Amino acid sequence: MIPHDKFIDKIKQYIDEKKLFSFGDHVIIGLSGGADSVCLLLVLKRLQQIYNLSITAIHVHHGIRGESAEHDLKFSRQLCEKEEIEFVEKRCDVPALAAKHHLTEEEAGRRVRYETFECEAKKRGASVIAVAHHMDDQAETVLMNLLRGSGIRGCSGIPCKRSLSDKGDIVVVRPLLGMRREAIEAWLIESGQEWCIDETNLTDDYLRSRIRNRLLPLLSSEYNAQAAEHIACAAGDFSEAEEYLRDQAQALFSSWNCVLHKQMMLPVKELK
């Protein structure tokens, strides 16, 4: 386990290594009230002066989970008041959106969140959206993609940094991607900080939930205690390989100058 006083240092090291922030960035934080996003908020607040960050936290109410969701909203608002961080709340009807667009509620919720983050970022001239995915999320994503038959891109998992649009003016960063869930919760407990628990994460209704609650613990307990770390590390290797192959393919296509009248022409002899 990471010593309490080294926890923030480890995250800062990851931020600097991956170049997630620039000095003076305005950062939008996705704040659900769960352990991961609460940790992210508190860590970035403590690093605020080092990077000269402006911080805005956004909580999206999905229109599900009844009183539990209202509790999470109130908790998130009060936490931001305590930490003197700008707070924005957004209410939406995720079940209706899911039905309208033939999506799962999980997919619809994700769409609403990122659309909200992007909208609020543009209003404020913010260039960075920080979300709280961690190493266990990375391992779950890789396993889920493998089970769905994904190739090298799916095995790359969750990127630590990506552009939200083709323009590249807003990026999504994940400062906690190098941390285990248990380390995050341990740090919060030692800090005396409470968090909200989404009871839907405790069910096995979704594939990701079953991987989180059953498969990954089985791999860790019966095969290798560091299973999550090794899977996340492999995701990084796959990501580098995928980037290399993409760059090589792009260079090859460019050298062939093979686009003619909006059609792609490939030199078959060179491919043999």
Regions found by a protein language model. Give the residues of each.
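Core alpha/beta nucleotide-donor-binding catalytic domains of modification enzymes
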Residues: 1-31, 35-214
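ATP/NTP-dependent adenylation/nucleotidyl-transfer catalytic domains that generate, transfer
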Residues: 164, 169-170, 206-272
